[in-house]
Regions:
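Gram-negative outer-membrane beta-barrel transporters
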Residues: 465, 560, 564-568, 587-668, ...
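Short acidic/polar hinge/loop motifs at secondary-structure boundaries
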Residues: 74-76, 163, 190-217, 532
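N-terminal periplasmic accessory domains that precede
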Residues: 101-106, 151-154, 171-174, 186, ...
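Flexible loop and strand-edge segments within Gram-negative outer membrane beta-barrel domains
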Residues: 283-304, 315-369, 375-409
Length: 749
């Protein structure tokens, strides 16, 4: 298929959605009566859900209403009336208004730095400064400014986080020097399944329907169980809480051959809410060498759909939701001798879907019940074809183990009961967690294996004085394959003075091997990888210290933080080269990481924000009990980002820079640990976005990887069982240009 046809195919979907959006906009965009428009005096942006009171001067009782998300409310008074407009964080406005009069009201901000609300690890939704855990929040505004289309693009320039690239297995995340197999990925509190080589492919997490992302670094095993030794990444999806009907469409193009489209519609009526969205992401592949048939970045096509229905009552909220993901990845093989007219091509199809039901109860006396049940399915199928490049005919290879389907099914049930009253000295949370995972496929020993993990947990929050909080917690686990230890943690928060907070925690962590690490058997012409039923479970100790200071003065806000950590993990599981080209999952007896992070941000309301960060992470390891871990080997990274919003033209300029220092790498080869490193490199992204038609349309453009960083020399460590040998590592596909178009239209009562 030609490049021009690909463009028409991808953008044709969006133009259909654009016509629907324009129809909605033309029907509801132009008011036919007098309206009051409430805007922020500094930002010149609408103030949504402001409280408006109309009261007749001569007679009549007060009438109350709320502005729409566009900051509008109809003026339907019959006589001259007093109008009062109020909203949290703004000075109350008073005036008089006549029948049929349209009025623009400028509210004066009284608070310039509103605190974010977080839910990860909390008894109930809390402001971020009240959380006993240090939480990093990546807002929807930041996602839009970076023009990130998936989780890999979003996290690669975060301080202290490292994103690694593999052509077939995708991208993986490292936190505090610990690999992605120790990072728990959640979507609205439910674990995502479908890891490859222990890591979750970040390219498979799209951001089209994401409200914000909450990241906690450090063990959260008491609350979230296995795979949470390094931390938790919780993806919070959007919900339409205001408009009767909302239609949106997005299209994204990147010059390397990326074409992404997404369309969604949501509605609210009385207490009922509906949402349905779907899209297609396409990447045509990229190779550093035009003469090579083997592509450095594999072509892929993704389809995804998600939807939900919710009922919100005075006490209870009930939500049914589901999502579907389908990816096709093509791994082109090398030309075969002797005529070099044929090749073996492999197609990897990944299908993942989840269905879930959530029930939340807000009870009297600040008590909360949350229940969730979910079923998730993951299937990855590999089909290999022998292709004749002269006739373009291909035939399925039916011999050996070159074809396979591996499946994982997961059943999850979770419930919590919490008491969280800020006026009380004692609060608590108790809950249960049920996880049952089944793996199937020819590469699984016996073609079917099942692991069950059943746990109960409790934590207590004690505030002896208003400035001091302690939160001990414990988790009791029964695992069908392993004798699990008692997992416990103690966290503390001390407000030393106003705006200066110290957080300290000690945590135990626990991770059981997954089905693939235990029972995988994968042998073909280029792979010889085996699971290990004798693996021991990982156990960890973690100490975290965080100091945060912030100061709000008028329109300016300044924040500084520092974070130190130490991790000691027994029996960390890695893929090791045990003999020749044979690889097996084994336990690395001792593994330690330590380091610190420094960060600062300064903003001047409403236009300017600057952030800078620095992280130092050290790693040490030993293969057996008698071998010392040796000295820590450290890596450094530095980040700098800034944005400026020009109010009148609604134009935003942003840049994102990261320096990644010399990074140590460890590999186990036949009971010996070999070390190496990846050379330092720099990346820089620049974006420019502008809103049109009262923010119904937004156009973004920019340059990604301005320094054209591609491959970086790697010394001392081979590429491993899933990639070809090389003395370099792929970082990015180079400098690219992008264009993004977003349309959103809303109808209100």
């Amino acid at each position: 298929m030609g490049r021009k046809n690909i463009i028409f195919q991808n953008f044709g979907l969006v133009w259909c959605a654009v016509l629907v959006c324009l129809a909605v906009g033309s029907s509801y965009g132009q008011p036919q009566q007098a309206f009051i428009h409430v805007t922020d005096q500094m930002k010149h942006e609408p103030v949504a859900f402001a409280n408006v009171c109309f009261e007749g001067i001569k007679h009549g009782s007060p009438k109350y209403g709320l502005t729409t998300i566009e900051g509008m409310i109809p003026n339907d008074v019959k006589d001259i009336s007093k109008i009062t407009v109020s909203y949290m964080g703004y000075t109350t406005y008073h005036d008089t208004i006549h029948p049929g009069q349209s009025l623009e009201i400028l509210l004066q901000p009284a608070v310039f730095n509103m605190k974010e609300i977080v839910v990860t690890g909390q008894y109930s939704p809390e402001t971020i400064d009240r959380s006993i855990y240090p939480i990093n929040v990546i807002s929807n505004r930041m996602i839009d400014m970076k023009a990130a289309t998936n989780m890999a693009e979003l996290l690669k320039e975060q301080s202290g986080l490292q994103v690694s690239q593999n052509g077939v297995l995708g991208t993986s995340l490292t936190i505090q020097g610990l690999s992605g197999q120790n990072v728990k990925f959640l979507q609205d509190g439910i674990p995502l399944i479908g890891r490859m080589n222990g890591n979750f492919d970040l390219n498979q997490i799209n951001l089209h329907n994401v409200d914000h992302i909450e990241i906690i670094e450090g063990p959260m095993s008491v609350i979230y169980g296995s795979n949470a030794i390094a931390g938790v990444v919780n993806i919070i999806t959007r919900e339409n809480r205001s408009s009767v009907l909302s239609v949106s469409a997005n299209a994204y193009y990147e010059s390397v051959g990326v074409f992404d489209t997404y369309v969604s519609v949501s509605a609210n009526k009385n207490k009922h809410g509906f949402y349905l969205g779907g899209g297609r992401d396409f990447f045509q592949g990229y190779s550093y060498l035009d003469t090579s048939r083997i592509e450095s970045f594999k072509p892929r096509r993704q389809y995804f759909f998600d939807g939900h229905y919710s009922y919100t009552g005075e006490v209870m909220k009930l939500k049914f939701s589901g999502d579907y993901f389908n990816e096709l990845l093509l791994d082109k093989g090398a030309l075969q001798p002797v005529y070099y007219e044929t090749a073996f091509d492999s197609y990897f199809t990944t299908v993942r879907y989840t269905g879930r039901v959530d029930a939340a109860f807000n009870l009297p006396r600040n008590q909360y019940i949350n229940l969730v049940a979910a079923y998730s399915s993951y299937n990855r199928r590999k089909l290999t074809y022998f292709k004749d490049l002269t006739t373009l005919q291909q035939n399925l290879v039916e011999t050996g183990s070159v074809n396979d389907t591996t499946g994982i099914q997961s059943i999850i049930a979770r419930g919590t009961f919490a008491n969280n009253n800020a006026e009380k000295k004692f609060n608590y949370q108790a809950g249960f967690d049920v996880n049952d995972e089944t793996g199937t496929g020819k590469r699984i020993l016996g073609e079917r294996q099942e692991i069950g993990d059943y746990a109960g947990f409790i934590s207590v929050k004690w505030d002896p004085v208003r400035s001091l909080s302690f939160q001990p917690g414990v988790r009791v686990i029964y695992n069908t394959k392993y004798r699990a230890p008692l997992v416990y943690a103690l966290s503390a928060k001390w407000s030393i003075v106003d705006n200066l907070n110290l957080r300290l925690s000690y945590s135990r962590g626990f991770r059981t091997p997954d089905v693939k690490e235990l029972y995988l058997s994968f042998v073909d012409i280029i792979h010889n990888v085996h699971g290990n039923p004798d693996l021991k479970a990982e156990k960890s100790h973690n100490i975290n210290l965080n100091l945060t200071w912030n100061n709000d003065h008028g329109r300016s806000s300044w924040e500084m933080h520092t974070n130190g950590f130490y991790n000691y993990i027994e029996n960390v599981i890695i893929l090791a080269q045990v003999k020749g080209l044979e690889y097996q999952y084994v336990n690395l007896v001792k593994y330690k990481t330590t380091g610190f992070q420094l960060g600062t941000s300064w903003s001047f309301y409403p236009s300017l924000k600057i952030q800078a960060g620095m992280a130092e992470t050290g790693i040490a390891a030993a293969a057996n009990e008698t071998e010392p871990t040796g000295a820590f080997v450290f890596a450094t990274d530095f980040t700098l980002s800034g944005s400026y919003h020009f109010i009148k033209p609604d134009l935003t300029f942003a840049l994102f820079y990261k320096y990644t220092g010399k990074s140590p790498q460890f590999q186990l080869n036949e009971d010996n640990i070999s070390s190496g490193y990846i050379d330092p490199y720099n990346t820089l992204d620049i974006t420019l976005s502008k809103g049109f038609w009262k923010q119904k349309i937004r156009l973004s453009t920019g340059v990604k990887n301005l320094f054209d960083t591609r491959t970086i020399p790697a010394t001392g460590v081979s590429s491993g069982a899933h990639t070809s040998s090389s003395n370099s590592t792929n970082i990015d596909w180079g400098r690219t240009f992008f264009l993004r178009l977003s349309l959103t239209f809303n109808k209100y009562k």
